[in-house]
């Protein structure tokens, strides 16, 4: 990648695509290289224009929400990175108890706004440091609830730029997975069916309880991506890692958290390669001890070292 390229303006000059933009501060791990091209659209029109431009140039496209559950290579990402950080809008329909939220909307904020209205269904989402778009792609969940439980429809872009409406039966939801991982499409918004079957105080109390539990059991002192591995039910990844004696283990600037072993921390000077190598080391040790290969929940983007 080169740092000397000028910005490109599309959509009659209204939409700026910038070259060589660092992505590290846009991820919760605080690591990673630069985007070859980058844009943070302020509305759906700019999103559609930038998406069309990248397709015309035959560039790879990466969508970036809150940057949680994500590890970006130190070498950065080729093509266009589209950040949804400005695509934040939500509407609550009191007649249907449905919530419509844009892809960049904060999941915890959405959960709290629903709770204040006494609408149940999103209490589980309060401690997940992600966006609506990421939740739809990953089928995010916690505390026994998940995105699939409340989803009514997803609006996404086809490659030709037309809006496609996906119903739950089109989403192929599984544990931390959806069709949008196998066949990626830009997510515009999601519509969620909630329920006004409790008082606002009850819903807020449950929401606060979930948040308190998360804060008391998970590390927040250093940057991380959230849970690194999927839970191989009925066991948990954290328990297997802890029983393998890996709590506190470090490689470079990456460390297995003492508070919760399914978290890897950037202890201050980690690189993406440090974190990648520690993920692989944890997998090796757990497999040696338990004959079970932990599957990463964190999504890895870009080029990483070959594992032999």
Curated annotation (Swiss-Prot):
Q: In which pathway does it act?
A: Cell wall biogenesis; peptidoglycan biosynthesis
Residue intervals of the FAD-binding PCMH-type domain = 30-213
Highest taxon listed in the record's lineage: Bacteria
Localization per record? Cytoplasm
Q: What keywords sit in the KW lines? A: Cell cycle, Cell division, Cell shape, Cell wall biogenesis/degradation, Cytoplasm, FAD, Flavoprotein, NADP, Oxidoreductase, Peptidoglycan synthesis
Give the Enzyme Commission number: 1.3.1.98
GO biological process terms, alphabetically, are: cell division; cell wall organization; peptidoglycan biosynthetic process; regulation of cell shape
| GO MF annotations in UniProt | FAD binding; UDP-N-acetylmuramate dehydrogenase activity
Matching entries from InterPro entries are given as: FAD-bd_PCMH, FAD-bd_PCMH-like_sf, FAD-bd_PCMH_sub1, FAD-bd_PCMH_sub2, MurB, MurB_C, MurB_C_sf, Oxid_FAD_bind_N
Active site as annotated:
176, 227, 297
Write down the Gene3D superfamilies for this protein, in alphabetical order: 3.30.465.10, UDP-N-acetylenolpyruvoylglucosamine reductase, C-terminal domain, Uridine Diphospho-n-acetylenolpyruvylglucosamine Reductase, domain 2
Listed under catalytic activity are: UDP-N-acetyl-alpha-D-muramate + NADP(+) = UDP-N-acetyl-3-O-(1-carboxyvinyl)-alpha-D-glucosamine + NADPH + H(+)
- Asked if the record carries the keyword Transferase, the reply is no
UniProt GO cellular component terms:
cytosol
The record's listing under PROSITE patterns reads:
FAD_PCMH
Cofactor(s) listed: FAD
Purpose: Cell wall formation.
Assigned protein family = Belongs to the MurB family.
Quote the protein name from its UniProt record.
Answer: UDP-N-acetylenolpyruvoylglucosamine reductase
This protein's encoding gene: murB
């Amino acid at each position: 990648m080169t740092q000397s390229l000028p910005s490109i303006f599309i959509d009659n000059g209204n939409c700026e695509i910038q070259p060589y933009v660092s992505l590290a501060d846009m991820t919760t791990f605080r690591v990673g290289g630069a985007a070859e091209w980058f844009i943070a659209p302020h509305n759906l029109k700019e999103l559609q224009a930038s998406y069309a431009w990248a397709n015309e140039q035959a560039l790879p496209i990466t969508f970036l929400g809150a940057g949680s559950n994500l590890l970006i290579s130190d070498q950065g990402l080729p093509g266009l990175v589209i950040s949804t950080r400005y695509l934040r809008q939500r509407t609550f329909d009191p007649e249907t108890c449905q919530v419509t939220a844009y892809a960049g909307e904060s999941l915890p904020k959405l959960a709290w706004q629903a709770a204040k209205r006494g609408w149940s269904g999103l209490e589980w989402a309060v401690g997940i440091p992600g966006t609506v778009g990421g939740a739809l792609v990953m089928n995010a969940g916690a505390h026994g609830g998940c995105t699939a439980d409340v989803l009514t429809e997803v609006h996404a872009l086809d490659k030709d730029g037309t809006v496609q409406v996906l119903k739950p039966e089109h989403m192929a939801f599984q544990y931390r997975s959806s069709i949008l991982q196998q066949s990626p499409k830009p997510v515009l918004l999601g519509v969620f069916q909630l329920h006004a079957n409790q008082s606002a105080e009850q819903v807020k109390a449950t929401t606060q309880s979930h948040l308190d539990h998360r804060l008391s059991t998970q590390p927040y002192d250093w940057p991380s991506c959230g849970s690194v591995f999927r839970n191989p039910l009925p066991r948990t990844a954290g328990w297997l890692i802890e029983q393998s004696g890996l709590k506190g283990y470090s490689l470079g600037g990456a460390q297995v958290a003492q508070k919760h072993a399914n978290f890897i921390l950037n202890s201050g000077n980690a690189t993406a390669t440090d974190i990648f190598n520690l993920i692989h080391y944890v997998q090796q040790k757990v497999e040696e001890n338990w004959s079970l290969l932990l599957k990463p929940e964190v999504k890895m983007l870009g080029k990483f070292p070959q594992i032999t």
